[in-house]
From Swiss-Prot:
Pfam families: Ribosomal_L37ae (PF01780). This is Large ribosomal subunit protein eL43. It comes from Ostreococcus lucimarinus (strain CCE9901). InterPro entries: Ribosomal_eL37/eL43, Ribosomal_eL43, Ribosomal_protein_eL43, Ribosomal_zn-bd. One of its GO terms (biological process) is translation. It comes from the Eukaryota.
Length: 92
């Protein structure tokens, strides 16, 4: 069978509806939410989305709260880097 969605990928299900720019934004979110992420607990790429904001690892069965479409949100990355920077400053 021929591959029908070479350019559009996962958003091919929407056809020509909703406009190209909106489908491009949705594609980024849907690819992110269906991909596997790195698990901080066991070190494997096994974190998958179970529901909105709930992520679980297939390797170690740990469940973690995260973002709606990706495991780490922009705010959580900023907070984590700030905490690490402050921790290193107090250790010196």
């Amino acid at each position: 069978m021929a591959k029908r969605t070479k350019k559009v990928g996962i958003v091919g299900k929407y056809g020509t509806r909703y406009g190209a720019s909106l489908r491009k934004v949705v594609k980024k979110q849907e690819v992110s939410q269906h991909s596997k992420f790195f698990c901080d607990f066991c070190g494997k790429y096994g974190m998958k989305r179970k529901a909105v904001g709930i992520w679980s690892c297939k390797g170690c069965n740990k469940t973690k709260a995260g973002g709606a479409y990706s495991l780490n949100t922009g705010g959580s990355v900023t907070v984590r880097s700030t905490i690490r920077r402050l921790r290193e400053a107090t250790e010196k």
